[in-house]
């Protein structure tokens, strides 16, 4: 009888552990997340110090994180006011980025894939974005075409924005990064 209780308890513990781990991975939760405004990053993703849940998520999704010497990657699922990004709304991504050799801003699905659109524009890079005289930029994320830097949403039902900074001086380990260090995401009109 004691052996049966032990086995049932062990099986219940394994099942509960599996359910909790699956839930953490599905919700993309992590324990080493750094945040600057709406942007969330995992500065330890490309290092030996990565937390086990982030490591499992990367193995599960076949994601290729940037190494610590390569740069940092950030994802925004909310605007700067904290509201979730909605595909029926226009957003203005504006400001600048910290000193970096190269950066990219990409529209991705909730699972991290590029979102197809008729314009075949999936993102912007620091080499091609049109900037203001002070070096800042404005990118409009919207379903319908806009003049200037326009990033089309396509037929996406949900999306996120990914900002990658390559060869950057930004270091979450030694520096407190404020919300103004990365671009702001402001909601415009909604359909």
Question: What is each model feature region?
Answer:
Residues 1-191:
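A compositional/structural signature for long, glycine/proline-rich flexible linkers
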